[in-house]
Amino acid sequence: MTETIRERVGWEYYYYGNLPYRRGDPGWYTFDNRPRFNNNYVGLRNRMAILSEAYSYATFEERIMATLYFVEEILNHAADQRTAIEQVIATAEAIPLAGMDLGVRFQPSMNQESVEILMGDVETLRNPYSGSSYYERKDTVYTQTMPEWGAFEPTETARAPAHYVVSASAASVVGAYLDTHGVIYSSISEADERELEAFTIDSTTVSSREFQQIFERTLFGSSSSKWVAVEEGSLIVSTSQPLGRLVFYLLEPRSDDGLVNWAQLDKWLEPGKDYPIY
């Protein structure tokens, strides 16, 4: 696609990235791994999504045209590769997750080879009406070689279970989110006792800054096998379904973007007690 657009209009395209000019090692960094960002979420649903962003210092017209060319080539490529795309999706949906170690927390990973990034210069000007300063792009382009952090690697994993058991007390809250995401689950009609893996909470931290009207939470603790009294009305959520990876990300206690992180299970999270999902 990059070559096609270059031949068509003479413009250069590359993977989304930023230069951390205030902190971090110099390099080309992609954006956040968490599924709160739409295309990451779509990927968790075993579908494909493309982030499209135009260069910040391009003119409005250039940004519109750059986006148009990019979207056109994406659609052309998807149409040409539709059979391969369908096969990839079908394979992803058929993978059994039970017993797999999947990531719950991540960090950027550096690519093995450095990349050449086209850079430009700007000059600082002052707005004659407001007096505030702003940047204006200069007509200069040069290439800078730098490392690229274009993907992520897990810093912590958890083993995916065959299914989760959601305590009856938390069933209405968790069930509402599962319904929103289109996850399949069932309800236990008769109480019994089962040997399950329980996550026992030893501590919890809460972000000091509010984000979207919540304070993000992190749980700490340990897992062990124990006999649990499973009440009528508890939920069974299998990972053997097309949305199994999404189920895992939502319900794991240490997930960096699940229900715990979004403070939706706070009333059940006390040190010394079990996380209400087994």
Regions of interest found by a model, annotated:
Residues 1-278:
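Structured catalytic-domain cores with a bias toward divalent-metal coordination
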